[in-house]
């Protein structure tokens, strides 16, 4: 399996796969469950980050099991989706952003495979946290389809499950954050540690607290995701055939890459 999709809020079924079966993978960090099917004659994995019925909150997702399972299945490329709030007035609800950097404001998560001992003490380079090759494919595909997708944006990850305060949003904006969400860290970190190419499609569902004129709710997030779901599916469907079979990026050469 070369490619896997990780679906965020509102994306519990990619709607593009045929001959689907469920696969449970046992890892040193617990079990991970994903759907495996076929698209364009190729086996593709789909993993709903929050579970099929959105029962797992962001701070309880077993990120290590999920990423380890993908590595065990020989996945090389990951296309992830995420619903986000926007702190940037240029990024409006309904827009897509192909993320290229992050800020980490999480607090309690286990965010590395390198815990010392057998894995050693490793300091992985994060100069390029997201795969530029996947990012380019996504941006070019969106342009071809006429889908509004911003090329680059900084994702600020908070602990959740509560939404952020207006003061926190002002801080994030001053530090350069364009988007705010609750799931991308440690997911992108772990993917990088095991040498996976990782691309994130962020869909703006609301303006962040203190910017939005209305109180925030998860129902609003799901409503925008539902309205824009076809564009998201089209973007993923059309991007997959354009992903080169040979990796020409440096993702597989991440310093201290762990062997599964």
From Swiss-Prot:
NCBIfam families (alphabetical): MTAP, PRK09136.1
Pathway: Purine metabolism; purine nucleoside salvage
GO cellular component: cytosol
GO MF terms held by the record: S-methyl-5-thioadenosine phosphorylase activity
SUPFAM superfamilies reported in the protein's UniProt record: Purine and uridine phosphorylases
Enzymatic class: transferase
Other observations noted: Although this enzyme belongs to the family of MTA phosphorylases based on sequence homology, it has been shown that conserved amino acid substitutions in the substrate binding pocket convert the substrate specificity of this enzyme from 6-aminopurines to 6-oxopurines.
Disulphides: none
Species: Moorella thermoacetica (strain ATCC 39073 / JCM 9320)
InterPro entries: MTAP, Nucleoside_phosphorylase_d, Nucleoside_phosphorylase_sf
Highest taxon above the source species: Bacteria
Name of the protein this chain belongs to: Probable 6-oxopurine nucleoside phosphorylase
């Amino acid at each position: 399996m070369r490619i896997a999709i990780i679906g965020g809020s509102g994306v519990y079924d990619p709607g593009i796969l045929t001959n689907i079966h469920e696969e449970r993978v046992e890892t040193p960090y617990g079990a991970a469950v994903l759907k495996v099917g076929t698209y364009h004659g190729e086996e593709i994995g789909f993993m709903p980050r929050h579970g099929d019925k959105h029962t797992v909150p962001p701070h309880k997702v077993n990120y290590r099991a999920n990423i380890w399972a993908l590595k065990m299945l020989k996945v090389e490329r990951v296309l992830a989706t995420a619903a986000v709030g926007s702190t940037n007035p240029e990024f409006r609800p309904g827009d897509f952003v192909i993320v290229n950097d992050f800020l980490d404001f999480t607090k309690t998560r286990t965010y590395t495979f390198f815990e010392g001992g057998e894995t050693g003490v490793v300091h992985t380079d994060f100069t390029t946290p997201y795969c530029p090759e996947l990012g380019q494919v996504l941006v070019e595909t969106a342009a071809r389809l006429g889908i509004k997708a911003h090329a680059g944006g900084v994702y600020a990850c908070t602990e959740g499950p509560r939404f952020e305060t207006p003061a926190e949003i002002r801080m994030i904006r001053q530090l350069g954050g364009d988007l705010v969400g609750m799931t991308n860290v440690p997911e992108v970190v772990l993917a990088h540690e095991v040498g996976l190419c990782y691309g994130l499609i962020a869909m703006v569902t609301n303006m962040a607290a203190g910017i939005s004129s209305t109180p925030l709710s998860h129902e609003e997030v799901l409503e925008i995701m539902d309205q824009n779901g076809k564009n998201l599916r089209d973007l993923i469907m059309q991007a997959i055939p354009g992903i080169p079979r040979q990796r020409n990026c440096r993702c597989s050469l991440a310093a201290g890459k762990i062997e599964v």
